[in-house]
């Protein structure tokens, strides 16, 4: 098999110039009354969810689907046509062919994580708006380049943190911002569980239906084994950052939505890899983040919070006057020991979302700013990248939040 490596560093050097599409920034000016033409890159789990959500919108036309796995691609096209007989999507194995089309307004990206930034930046350069998947980027520097390119091209971007649009997230932010808990000094975030090792499976010839070289793309070359692909790719640092990278943005979102923390100075992460297989992301990870006036703790174990042992994923805010615990799965809040649906005395101050996909489409039409916009989610994703660097280096990292540089540690 021919071994390829697009080269992540070379891509980042080139992406400030024209990339593949720098001369093509001729954004389709879709009048608000017309349909938005959407293409989907990645048709697996979340890709399928986005195909369903967008194709259900009356002002959306699904014109293209793309996947390096031809079996998944054919199945997703069939499901779309069964649900919506009027749909006539063209199918592609290479997303760059989609970006050559002048009639496409929006590209969704639900690829493995190591492709997120590349697809988005190429789409920005081609004059497309983008609905992306979490995590925002594979690396901190890629996130910076994404924001630079988006700003230059004027593209609209929304990250697919659908829970951000929920009334409960808005309500928690209103309660915290109301001051009823006093000044918040500590926030605890958690998602129990971590990576498995997956044993030591033998390498295989990739299925004829999978373009393994294209799947790898900018990642280091590796021989194919099923565990590296599709649903379990995220347990390899070549492609993602494990459970931590998968869930950080969902839980950190309520922190950033509520408090907008600034002035990150130190990041200290500890953890352990499984050791019983080829996967190398943490089976557990604890991380401490020092922001200006705020300490944030992440763990993959139940935190020292009353009732948290029954919550696999959540957030806990500790204020001068009280505490608030958010259960991500049941979407309940707990003030002290009392489980509540709401605090009726706290006024509604934040506008409610029409739904995450709808919020994005409305921004595409108005050229406005969606809720999970790129500057917001990049700032939210940055601590995750630094924590993974701290974990892999096995030492605390000092961060200059003004220059956005690690202080005194070139290896980071």
Question: How does the language model describe each region?
Answer:
Residues 2-132, 141-156:
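N-terminal glycine-/serine-/threonine-rich beta1-alpha1-beta2 phosphate-ribose binding loop
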Residues 37-40, 62-66, 108-109, 131-132, ...:
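Structural recognition of the beta-strand scaffold that forms the well-ordered cores
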Residues 46, 115, 137-138, 164-165, ...:
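Glycine-/small-residue-rich active-site loops that bind phosphorylated ligands and cofactors
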Residues 55, 99, 150, 176, ...:
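Hydrophobic residues in alpha-helical segments
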Residues 57-59, 101, 178-181, 209, ...:
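Alpha-helix termination/capping residues and helix-transition junctions
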Residues 129-131, 137-214:
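A contiguous active-site-proximal alpha/beta segment in oxidoreductase catalytic domains
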Residues 171, 183, 188, 195-334, ...:
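Contiguous beta-strand/loop segments that form the cofactor/metal-binding neighborhood of enzyme cores
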């Amino acid at each position: 098999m021919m071994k390829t490596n697009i080269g992540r560093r070379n891509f980042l050097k080139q992406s400030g110039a024209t990339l593949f599409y720098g001369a093509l920034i001729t954004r389709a000016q879709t009048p608000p009354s017309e349909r938005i033409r959407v293409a989907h890159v990645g048709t697996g789990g979340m890709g399928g969810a986005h195909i369903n959500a967008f194709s259900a919108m009356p002002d959306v036309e699904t014109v293209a689907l793309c996947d390096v796995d031809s079996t998944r691609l054919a199945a997703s096209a069939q499901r779309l046509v069964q649900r919506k007989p009027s749909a006539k999507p063209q199918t592609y194995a290479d997303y760059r062919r989609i970006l050559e089309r002048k009639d496409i307004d929006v590209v969704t990206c639900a690829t493995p994580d190591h492709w997120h930034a590349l697809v988005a930046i190429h789409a920005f350069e081609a004059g497309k708006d983008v609905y992306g998947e979490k995590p925002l980027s594979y690396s901190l520097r890629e996130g910076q380049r994404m924001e630079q390119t988006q700003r230059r091209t004027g593209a609209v971007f929304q990250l697919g943190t659908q829970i951000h649009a929920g009334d409960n997230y808005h309500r928690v932010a209103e309660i915290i911002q109301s001051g009823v808990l006093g000044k918040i000094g500590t926030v605890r975030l958690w998602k129990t569980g971590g990576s498995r090792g997956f044993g030591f499976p033998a390498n295989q010839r990739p299925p004829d239906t999978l373009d393994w070289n294209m799947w790898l793309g900018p990642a280091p070359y590796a021989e194919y084994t099923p565990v590296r692909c599709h649903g379990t790719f995220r347990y390899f640092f070549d492609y993602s950052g494990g459970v931590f990278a998968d869930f950080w943005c969902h839980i950190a979102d309520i922190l950033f939505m509520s408090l907008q923390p600034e002035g990150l100075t130190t990041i200290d992460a500890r953890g352990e890899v499984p050791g019983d297989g080829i996967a190398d992301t943490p089976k557990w990870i604890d991380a401490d983040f020092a922001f200006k006036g705020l300490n944030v703790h992440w763990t993959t174990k139940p935190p020292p919070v009353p009732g948290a042992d029954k919550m696999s994923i959540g957030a806990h805010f500790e204020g001068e006057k009280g505490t608030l615990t958010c259960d991500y799965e049941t979407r309940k809040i707990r003030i002290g020991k009392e489980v509540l649906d709401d605090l009726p005395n706290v006024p509604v101050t934040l506008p409610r979302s029409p739904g995450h996909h709808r919020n994005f489409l409305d921004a595409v039409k108005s050229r406005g700013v969606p809720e999970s916009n790129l500057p917001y989610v990049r700032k939210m994703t940055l601590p995750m990248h630094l924590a993974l660097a701290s974990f892999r280096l096995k030492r605390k990292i000092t961060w200059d939040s003004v220059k956005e540089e690690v202080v005194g540690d070139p290896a980071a």
